Amino acid sequence: MDFLMSGLAACGACLFTNPLEVVKTRMQLQGELRAPGTYQRHYRNVFHAFITIGKVDGLAALQRGLAPALLYQFLMNGIRLGTYGLAEAGGYLHTAEGTLNPVRSAAAGALAGVMGAYLGSPIYMVKTHLQAQAATEIAVGHQYNHQIFPPQSWKVALAAAMVSGIAVVLAMTPFDVVSTRLYNQPTDAQGKGLMYRGLLDALLQTARTEGIFGMYKGIGASYFRLGPHTILSLFFWDQLRMVYYTYTK
């Protein structure tokens, strides 16, 4: 739980500070390996950078790279703070007398920091590439134009379907749990359910009694069933459309 809380706390902060990260990245790349006065300064200071990026690239550009930034913060700070929290809760940072040991505390912090940085480094690179992308007139540093899959590739459809499969499972599992229970509940002589009055009642009872996690019971099995089903459905649908449009042009 320490890992989860630490990661979520860092993500919450990242939502508000990511625009500053975009500005910082652009300013750090400006004039890379060039002597002062030999290059055009697109960003004179922090405030000018905010205005310039918002005006030329659009306000949405100030949140560029937000997805990898959130993942980076969740992994790095979740591992860093979570590991340190576990060490503290386990009593590894204190002496036999109960006082804080500075050496152990520093060692635990360093180890947690190294682990977080090592795992977060690839994501930080992706974040930097995205945040550096800008319109030609205010571009600084090397401009990456990543394209993992070629257009119209079956891999694009497969990757998109995998992501949408996760979204479908997250959205539908509570209703799947409730429908399973509604169909399985005992009934009286008139066929009326003895445990739930209907869909809403089943949702409320499950949430009150079993909590939010009760609404997601069997989510792993749901994904292994619904995930491949969604993936294959969208994949075949995309391929059939490509074949159809190819031969009807």
Swiss-Prot record:
Primary localization class, coarse: mitochondrion
Topological category with respect to the lipid bilayer: Multi-pass membrane protein
Location of this chain's protein in the cell: Mitochondrion inner membrane
Keyword entries, A-Z: Membrane, Mitochondrion, Mitochondrion inner membrane, Repeat, Transmembrane, Transmembrane helix, Transport
Superkingdom classification of source: Eukaryota
Start-end of each Solcar repeat: 1-90, 152-243
GO cellular component terms listed in the entry, alphabetical order: mitochondrial inner membrane
PROSITE patterns: SOLCAR
Transmembrane segments: 38-58, 59-79, 154-174, 226-249
InterPro entries: Mito_Carrier_Antiporter, Mitochondrial_sb/sol_carrier, Mt_carrier_dom_sf
Catalytic activity: a dicarboxylate(in) + sulfate(out) = a dicarboxylate(out) + sulfate(in)
Protein family per UniProt: Belongs to the mitochondrial carrier (TC 2.A.29) family.
PANTHER family: RE38146P, SOLUTE CARRIER FAMILY 25 MEMBER 35
Entry function: Putative antiporter that exchanges dicarboxylates and sulfur oxoanions across the inner membrane of mitochondria.
Name of this protein: Solute carrier family 25 member 35
Biological source species: Bos taurus (Bovine)
